[in-house]
Amino acid sequence: HEAAGERINGRVLVDGSGVGTYLRHLVPLSRQAIGLDIEFPRVQESHAFAELVVCGAGEHLPFPTGSIDVIFSHEVLEHVQDDQATVQEMVRVLRPGGRIVLFCPNRGYPFETHGIYWRGKYHFGNIPLVNYLPRRLRDKLAPHVRVYTRADLARLFAGLPVQVVTKRTIFGAYDNIIERHPRLGKALRAVLQALEKTPLQRMGLSHFWVIEKTA
């Protein structure tokens, strides 16, 4: 809400809306909350929260140029086929002054949270140190998902009519740990969120960027 400002009251797009978690919170705040997801079963599910949810890909947004006030993209960019085209499309559909609120995986995080492929078999879980390997080897182990440095993100937005309003690296909420071990989870979250105010934020789970369209 804070990142979007008064724009939250306009037309809001959740790019990668999944089962509708964000839509549920945005519908009461906005003039129109729109969902987009590439998986049709998820589109059907999220219709429970918003009237307009479309099945489509981030590389080809089915919206007019300059028609959206805010775009939320939460841990989606790393999964699309073409992240450059996806970024360009988000910027295209934004109105001047509109904002993208973007979360995506940080290469500095000590774990690969999407699992890896090893000897042709997928291994689920948080795999340590994978993201610290040379890019070619890292991408061979995790070809199904990208990670980003700040420089990687800057290159994606280079040459586009935007300015970066917020550029941070954050740790997670660790809700799963809190659910199983409340005291430990809350203590861990407090410590890691305190690190967000130090140089160690570079080891955070995700990039949190707010990007504003300038023209």
Descriptions of predicted regions:
Residues Q81-E89, R99-V210:
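S-adenosyl-L-methionine-dependent methyltransferase catalytic module, highlighting the catalytic core
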Residues H1-T113, F208-K213:
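Conserved SAM-binding loop
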